[in-house]
Amino acid sequence: MKNKLPPFIEIYRALIATPSISATEEALDQSNADLITLLADWFKDLGFNVEVQPVPGTRNKFNMLASCGQGAGGLLLAGHTDTVPFDDGRWTRDPFTLTEHDGKLYGLGTADMKGFFAFILDALRDVDVTKLAKPLYILATADEETSMAGARYFAETTALRPDCAIIGEPTSLQPVRAHKGHISNAIRIQGQSGHSSDPARGVNAIELMHDAIGHILQLRDNLKERYHYDAFTVPYPTLNLGHIHGGDASNRICACCELHMDIRPLPGMTLNELNGLLNDALAPVSERWPGRLTVDELHPPIPGYECPPNHQLVEVVEKLLGAKTEVVNYCTEAPFIQTLCPTLVLGPGSINQAHQPDEYLETRFIKPTRELITQVIHHFCWH
């Protein structure tokens, strides 16, 4: 029953008070089960059917799909339930206590992005879901901040094909229709150790890596020359060498050297294409030194994403907001949801507050966000 739903600020408070940290380090990683239970109960109270989906390969993580209405198409509103870890020494407030001060709501996940679910629930108070002409879906995912396992698994397994989707990441209510992807690899070279007084008796992994880096930097130049997307502030794929380590003593021939690098591909560039380009770039080293060079993923890759600029979703949202869609450099779950239907990234709060101590969402977003959610539900589910 709708009258069982708590007030907006109490929903928000309960979401923030329920820890759901995602981390690659097991000691910091937390299940999102309690948060999923909260959301599931509230959407059931609103008359939605709720499905909770365990996500394989995670530490007790779940997706939730709440659905209402019959037929094909409809609207999907999506977001992730997890947050990043927090640095206790840098927060001046309790991260798990929603605190309002000077026009800001403070707490871990206020902007990125538990708050979006509070806005959805609050907007649905005034929607008679029994009269929907098309279905409305609410998706809450797991592990966006690490592997994006929840969105990946949902996209791989669902039969849903909504007309369109909105992911409520903090975009300051500016609609986003494209972003770059992210690929992070470890280049590892296995040499042969020996005493530095006789270099011919060993294979110096640092020297081989020096050769490999030269080819990687040539790839960086080729990416810049070959691929362009003028809407981005950096209108080409970037390649960064971020970390390198090799050897353990000045008088030993280095046996192992490891380089960590990332590529930020443009929308439309496939992961297979990028892997092929990297392997081709490193082929001269691999051919000269068989079996000594390997390339491994550091994290699951995220492809670039783009919603067709002429899609009805873009036209409707631009008209409602009086703002043109944008492109951004950070990554979201949009590439995976986009495999199901045209998708925009659009939500309250600023990305500048995400992953920061004393994270907050400005209260000025409350009214326009509620209005926007109501409007898109009416447009895509009532007509």
Curated annotation (Swiss-Prot):
Pfam families to which the protein is assigned, alphabetical: M20_dimer (PF07687), Peptidase_M20 (PF01546)
Reactions catalysed according to its record: N(2)-acetyl-L-ornithine + H2O = L-ornithine + acetate
Principal cellular location given in the protein's record: cytoplasm
InterPro entries: AcOrn-deacetyl (IPR010169), ArgE/DapE_CS (IPR001261), Bact_exopeptidase_dim_dom (IPR036264), Peptidase_M20 (IPR002933), Peptidase_M20_dimer (IPR011650), Peptidase_M20A (IPR050072)
Signal peptide interval: none
Cofactor: Zn(2+); Co(2+); glutathione
HAMAP family on file: ArgE (MF_01108)
Superkingdom of this protein's organism: Bacteria
Positions of Zn(2+) 2 binding: 112, 145, 355
GO molecular function: acetylornithine deacetylase activity; zinc ion binding
EC number: 3.5.1.16
Nuclease is among the record's keywords: no
Cell location: Cytoplasm
GO cellular component: cytoplasm
Residues of the active site: 82, 144
Protein name as annotated: Acetylornithine deacetylase
Family: Belongs to the peptidase M20A family. ArgE subfamily.
Alphabetized UniProt keyword annotations: Amino-acid biosynthesis, Arginine biosynthesis, Cobalt, Cytoplasm, Hydrolase, Metal-binding, Zinc
GO biological processes: L-arginine biosynthetic process
Subunit structure: Homodimer.
Cofactor note as given: Binds 2 Zn(2+) or Co(2+) ions per subunit.
Entry keyword Kinase: no
